[in-house]
Amino acid sequence: MNYFPEIQIRTIQPSDNPDLALIVRNTLSEFGAANPGTVFFDPTTDALFELFQTPNSAYFVAEANGKILGGGGIYPTEGLPEGTCELVKMYLLPEARGIGLGRTLIEKCLETARENGFQQVYLETLDELHLALKIYAKFGFEYLPAPLGNTNHFGCGLWMLKRL
């Protein structure tokens, strides 16, 4: 198990964009999921700080000793039902997995969604990200038969929803 004695969770800064884009793309490549219709090819992956200036959105970065370990956020994706946001761009470096950091980031995102007045959190994911699926299920996310909203991530074949 890896140990990071002083992990900080903070909001995204402009200088985080390159590191976070690399973490997202490397993770998808690692799991064989660097496919069209995923965030791998989404241009916003290179401009997360700018994306998360949208009202009622938030992105949290996990950092230890000046090194970005990953992050995750919420976003009011177009076309989602009223009162619903999306859990987005939740990715961690390999050495930052299995230490509870993903759980901490999800908790922070869900808390922020509640504070922003959302009643539901939606997410899209892939079969290949099987470790994440287990965590989402533990948080009470339930599978949906079809996607919600207009994410344009046609490569994501699993959709989940959690009521807050």
Where are these regions (language model features)?
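Conserved glycine-rich acetyl-CoA-binding loop
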Residues: 67, 80-81, 93-107, 114-116, ...
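Acetyl-CoA-dependent GNAT
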Residues: 3-7, 11-95, 106-108, 112, ...
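C-terminal "cap" of GNAT-fold acetyltransferases
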Residues: 3, 23-26, 119-122, 126-164
